[in-house]
C-alpha cells in the first residue's frame, strides 16, 4: 500500500484524488490547499461541471474530507515544507499546484518528510516521464519526477510508434486545446501573454506550447525534430493533437494505421487508443487513454508526408497517468 498526499486541489488535484481512491494499492492520507476549507473541498469534490457528480459518499468534519467513509486530512499550508508528510508516512507527494514544479521548490515536500514527489506539470529541471514511452528508464534514486504535460502525454506515444516504425525526420504539432484555469472569463491583464488575456469562451486563441519539444526529453532520438503551437478553443475539456511529419521511410496510410492499431492492442494498450469511427471531442470526455488515434481524420500527401490526428481528455486522461506514474515510482522503490 502506497501512502499518497495531494498538494493543490484544483482541476487536476481533484481528478487525481477521484482516481487514486479507486485504486486498491493507494492510501490517500492528506490533501493540502491553502485556499480551501474542508466544507468547500467536499463540495468541489462532489460536484464537477465537466465530469459530473462523484459516484460515492462525500462529507467533511473540521479537519478532514471524508470519501466513501475514509477520513483524509486537509491542510491549508502555503509552504509545503511545513506539511507533516513525515509524520503521516507519505511515500509519494503529488504536487498539482503548478507552482512547485522545479527541483528546488518541489524538494520542499522531501524536506517535509515525503519519500518521493510526482509533479503534475512539465519541469525544466526534474526528469520527465511519460507512461508507455520512457517510464522504464526511471531509477529509484530519483526522488522528484515530472509527469510532463497532458499534450506531451498525447503526442509522445503517437510519435514513438511512428518513429520506431517509419522514422520521423521532422514534424510540426498543433494542439487544439480546451480552455484551462489560467485563461480569462472576460478580457483581462495578461502581461506575459497578451492573447492569453482575451475572453476564453469567445475566441480561438493562438498560444505557445513546449509540449512538442518536450517529446525530445522523453524520446532523445527525437530531440530537435519536433516543435509545435496551440490554439485554445472554447470547449471545457478534451483536446486534439494534429501531428504533421516528414518520414524517413516511404509507406502508405494503411500501413501507418495498422502500426498504430497494433500498438494500441499490444505494447501501448491502455495508453494509446485507436478508432476509425467518425468521432468528435465530446466522445472522449472521461477517456482514460493518454492518446486516442483518429484514423479517419488523418491524411497523407506523399509516401513520406502525413498528418496524424489524436484526441485526449486533457484532464481525466492526464490525471490517470499521474496516478499510474505514482504507482510505478512506488513499485520501483
From Swiss-Prot:
A GO biological-process term: glycolytic process
Residues flagged as site, Activates thiol group during catalysis: 177
Enzyme class: oxidoreductase
GO molecular function, one term: NAD binding
Assembly with partners or alone: Homotetramer.
Family: Belongs to the glyceraldehyde-3-phosphate dehydrogenase family.
Protein name in UniProt: Glyceraldehyde-3-phosphate dehydrogenase
Amino acid at each position: 500500500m502506497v501512502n499518497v498526499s495531494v498538494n493543490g486541489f484544483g482541476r487536476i488535484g481533484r481528478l487525481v484524488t477521484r482516481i487514486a481512491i479507486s485504486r486498491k494499492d493507494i492510501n490517500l492520507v492528506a490533501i493540502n490547499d491553502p485556499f480551501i476549507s474542508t466544507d468547500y473541498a467536499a463540495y468541489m469534490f462532489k460536484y464537477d461541471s465537466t465530469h459530473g457528480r462523484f459516484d460515492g459518499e462525500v462529507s467533511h468534519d473540521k479537519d478532514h474530507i471524508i470519501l466513501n467513509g475514509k477520513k483524509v486530512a486537509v491542510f491549508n499550508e502555503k509552504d509545503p515544507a511545513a506539511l507533516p508528510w513525515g509524520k503521516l508516512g507519505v511515500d509519494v507527494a503529488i504536487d498539482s499546484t503548478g507552482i512547485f514544479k522545479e527541483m528546488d521548490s518541489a524538494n520542499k515536500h522531501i524536506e517535509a518528510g515525503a519519500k518521493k514527489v510526482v509533479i503534475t506539470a512539465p519541469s525544466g529541471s526534474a526528469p520527465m516521464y511519460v507512461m508507455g514511452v520512457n517510464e522504464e528508464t526511471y531509477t529509484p534514486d530519483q526522488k522528484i519526477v515530472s509527469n510532463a504535460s497532458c499534450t506531451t502525454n498525447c503526442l509522445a506515444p503517437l510519435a514513438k510508434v511512428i518513429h520506431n516504425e517509419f522514422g520521423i525526420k521532422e514534424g510540426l504539432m498543433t494542439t487544439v486545446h480546451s480552455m484551462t484555469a489560467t485563461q480569462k472569463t472576460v478580457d483581462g491583464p495578461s502581461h506575459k501573454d497578451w492573447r492569453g488575456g482575451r475572453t476564453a469562451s469567445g475566441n480561438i486563441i493562438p498560444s505557445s506550447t513546449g509540449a512538442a519539444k518536450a517529446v525530445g526529453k522523453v524520446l532523445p532520438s527525437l530531440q530537435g525534430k519536433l516543435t509545435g503551437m496551440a490554439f485554445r478553443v472554447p470547449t471545457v475539456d478534451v483536446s486534439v493533437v494534429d501531428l504533421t511529419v516528414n518520414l524517413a521511410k516511404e509507406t502508405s496510410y494503411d500501413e501507418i494505421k495498422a502500426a498504430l492499431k497494433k500498438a494500441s492492442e499490444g505494447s501501448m494498450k491502455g495508453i494509446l487508443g485507436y478508432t476509425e469511427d467518425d468521432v468528435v471531442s465530446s466522445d472522449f470526455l472521461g477517456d482514460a487513454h493518454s492518446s486516442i488515434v483518429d484514423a479517419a481524420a488523418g491524411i497523407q500527401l506523399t509516401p513520406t508526408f502525413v498528418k496524424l490526428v489524436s484526441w485526449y481528455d486533457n484532464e481525466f486522461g492526464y490525471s490517470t497517468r499521474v496516478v499510474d506514474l505514482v504507482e510505478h515510482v512506488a513499485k520501483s522503490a
